[in-house]
Amino acid sequence: MKTLTQFFLFALFLCLMGSCGTAKLATNSYSPAPIQENQDYLTKSLFNSKDKTISEEGIAQILDSEIKLPDTIRLAILNYASNSINRYYSAYWSNEEFLKLQQSFIEIFKKKLSVNSKVKQIILMPKLMIGTNPNILTLRESAVRLQADLFLVFSVNSDIYYKYKAFKKDEAKAYATAEALLMDVRTGIIPFSDIVTRENQVTKDNMIDLSSQDTQKRAENGAIQLTLEELSTRVNDFLKEDK
């Protein structure tokens, strides 16, 4: 009887061992499903245009979402001009030199961004579209009317310091600060913004400067060009890096 009991206990032990081995084998053969990367992209605006606010839920969704830019981009550009640049231009809205200067600012961005493989089309936004007191919402609506995917707004401010010297040529030093924001028109989100400041110092050249005012303009225009060259490069780099 004792031998029979020992036999049953031994058989029971083998069954338990077999069950554990089977369970362990099943556990080892289990392969968890791969973790999916978050693909939650924001596809529409969550801003309420009526009261210019956004709900708490909208804030959370925006902060938890990503912006997916198109592979090919229609880019609208607006020069949100500052009055600081017109100090040397009488009746500046009709002054040919001033208008050419403003156009040259836009050309810096056009030249830099037109060679970007993602930029399909560059659209210049006319000033008459934005009115006298534009805000971020009305600017977005203007970009929609141009069917732009992205909207680049830039502005330039500058100041000049002039030194009169008794026995040397006069000098002019100018500082320019350029600001830019890039808006995703579909969502109203601004994925890129930057501020660049540069300085430029020149000495009065009697061959080309008829007055000290010409020297100051030359210094100012040089500083502005430096800021816009750098700023346009940063915008271009952002568009290249975006996936």
Residue ranges, per PLM feature:
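Surface-exposed short loop/turn segments
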Residues: 132-191
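C-terminal motif of bacterial Sec signal peptides marking the signal peptidase cleavage site
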Residues: 16-19
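Solvent-exposed, acidic/flexible segments
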Residues: 98-102, 132, 136, 171-173, ...
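Bacterial N-terminal signal peptides that target proteins for export
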Residues: 1-8
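C-terminal/domain-edge helix-coil "capping" segments
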Residues: 21-69, 185-194, 200-243
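N-terminal segment of the mature soluble domain
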Residues: 70-153
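Structured segments of extracytoplasmic/periplasmic soluble domains
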Residues: 112-116, 142-146, 157, 230-242
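A short acidic (Asp/Glu
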Residues: 88, 163-167, 239
